[in-house]
A protein has these predicted regions:
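Short beta-strand-centered segment that lines the nucleotide-binding/catalytic pocket of NTP-utilizing
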Residues: 14-23
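Short, well-ordered alpha-helix to beta-strand connector turns
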Residues: 9, 46-47, 78, 112
Length: 134
């Protein structure tokens, strides 16, 4: 992910990285403050939005609505990269509410290029090598 972001910057592609859970929390606060439309507009305009750790925890009603807004605003206009350790088949349950889950997943899954990575995580490998020399 870091190498990809570095390459995008070399190509002058504007990106924004966010942990999905943290982004939802920030946008809930901006909704309470009345600034969510401006924040969503900034997300909509970025060339590549990276949502990391997608579907790691169930979404509440407000987060579902915000996620739907983000995906709908960006759908077929701008690129969105989603990383997750949760299998795609389980995203439906994590998103919850059938109508929104259908709409979000239809836009994400059916118009995407999927790259599945297998094997040990880099963090785990780095930790082992640091402990071996530590």
């Amino acid at each position: 992910l870091h190498s990809l972001r570095r390459r995008q910057r070399q190509m002058c592609i504007r990106d924004r990285y966010a942990s999905t859970a943290k982004l939802m929390s920030q946008l809930k606060i901006s909704k309470a403050k009345g600034t969510i439309l401006a924040d969503l507009k900034r997300i909509e305009r970025v060339d590549l939005m990276i949502l990391d750790d997608f579907c790691m925890q169930p979404l509440d009603a407000q987060s579902r609505g915000i996620l739907m807004d983000i995906i709908e605003d960006r759908h077929q206009r701008r690129s969105t990269m989603i990383t997750s350790q949760i299998p795609v088949k389980d995203w439906y349950d994590v998103i919850g509410e059938k109508t929104i889950a259908d709409a979000v997943l239809d836009r994400i899954v059916h118009h995407s290029l999927r790259v599945e990575l297998f094997g040990e995580s880099i963090r785990k490998r780095k930790s082992k090598s640091e402990n071996a020399y530590g």
